Amino acid sequence: MVTQHSYRMHGAVYTKPIIVDLILDLTGYTSDKNLENFKLLDPSFGDGVFLEAAVHRLMDSLIRRGYRPNELIDHLGNCIRGIELRLEAYQAGRHRLQKVLEGYGFSKPEINWLINQWIIQADFLLWQEDTTEAIKFDFVVGNPPYVRQELIQDELIKKYRKRYTTIYDRADLYVPFIQHSLELLSEQGTLGIICSDRFTKNRYGKKLRKFITDNYKVRYIVDLHKTSPFENEVTAYPAIYVIKTKNYDKSVVRAVYTEVITSKVCQDAKDFLLSNQKPDQSSKEMKTYVFSEWFAGDEPWIIQSQECREILRRLENRFPLIEDDVHSCKIRIGVATGADKVYIVDPQQVDIEPEVLLPLVTTADISSGRIIWSGKHVINPFNSDGGLINLDDFPRLKTYFQQHEEIIKNRNVAKKNPSQWFRTIDRIYPEIVHQPKLLIPDMKNTNHIVKDDGAFYPHHNLYYILPGNWNIDILRAILLSSVVKFFIWSYATKMRGDTLRYQAQYLRKIRLPDPKSLTNDQKERLMDERVIQSQEYLDSIVAEIYQLSKTEIEIIKDALE
């Protein structure tokens, strides 16, 4: 369990200096300004890489105007502020700053005084809680910690939730860090951070998106999905966000996508973002985007292109959601047991009554694109009315559960409901087995839709769609198209290797045409397996159904590459 005094170590991912310099340049913390007149904050300074770069710029600002840095020491105490919770990181950052200041000729007492003014060991989320009376900063920069909620002590997360309105659903800790950082901006302040892009699209980020769009102005975004901006590898895709207070009067938002990080790419990015100078047309290392309007409310941020955004909006306005009454599709997730090693069994290897066993399909079973069943079953401890079975009626199952009682009772679901200690986390509905459905794995870099004619119960790593008013084969064909992948790509979090999350929250955003609107010819072609084997031919049919022009489907396919 992570406590208030140790969570930062679980989110410690340090930023490469080239990225630090890019962020400082984009926020405007540059040595051509009189930086002693500005306040800069790093809310989670880690090993001090942002603070080191900021101090160099502060000193250069003085030197280029003919000052010796220690001449103005009385003016420097409020220029820098760094917060760090973890003692080990705090001490490392302190040592780094000592070395920097020694290089500028400060005496030991001067160094100690400055550093004591500049850095604080504290929990940023509990620091300056009253933002109406808090010190305000002209620049807030850094790399907020990436820590999952479940790693935080219950009492501490309750404090955070009470204080930060953006903590929603299972929001990671960088979300309230961003909120508090924004709250501490001065009237003309600028935030420049590098963090996961998950909040821009997924469910848990919706309140932060609304908080930003209602109260601040997004200025620049640098999409770093395919680069390595940190000293250690991360699985979530990072991006740089530069956000200003509402007092900033320019509405244009500029964004950059790059697959490499080099000095030239960083310079090209700055030239475009700061001065609208586009890079050489021959350069394939960087793509640029301009938005005359930003997204409203809690809408997902789709930065890849204005054209993609316009196409998506037209599709959203023209076609109903997949679970709308006109479709009557249902999206569900498979069963979570809390102890798969106990609840998922091979009937040939255990002595359990067959009445409580349901055939189970897993992600591994559908990896080939069709079901190749492993023979596994899941134990169903529920009656048809949703209550738990009486174990005395199933003596062999009772003996089996008693053999594994310690594992079963150690699950959270059992601890919360001791009288129902042998239930699975999710209730099991046996009737699902016999319903035709489409199976979709959680993470994939392409649409992977496998039909189950009505023989299996899905495992919890699988989402499934009940076809409702649709012919299941026609629905599967449409879901395999680039148009449907475009919906997922637009809304879903991307992981390493261009992997998309095909979670229920994103699947539910898919738009479908009215099944009655399809012609007989379109239906026949979509039911032809040869069509599904040709992505290009399939996409041409589905584009026709969605009333997309040849240019529009090409824009979609280019974006997905």
Curated annotation (Swiss-Prot):
GO biological process: DNA restriction-modification system; methylation
SUPFAM superfamilies: S-adenosyl-L-methionine-dependent methyltransferases (SSF53335)
PROSITE patterns linked to this entry: N6_MTASE
EC number, UniProt record: 2.1.1.72
Molecular-function annotations in GO: DNA binding; site-specific DNA-methyltransferase (adenine-specific) activity
Pfam families, A to Z: Eco57I, TaqI_C
Catalytic activity line of the entry: a 2'-deoxyadenosine in DNA + S-adenosyl-L-methionine = an N(6)-methyl-2'-deoxyadenosine in DNA + S-adenosyl-L-homocysteine + H(+)
Broadest EC class assigned to this enzyme: transferase
Keyword Membrane: no
Protein name: Type II methyltransferase M.BstVI
Natural source organism: Geobacillus stearothermophilus (Bacillus stearothermophilus)
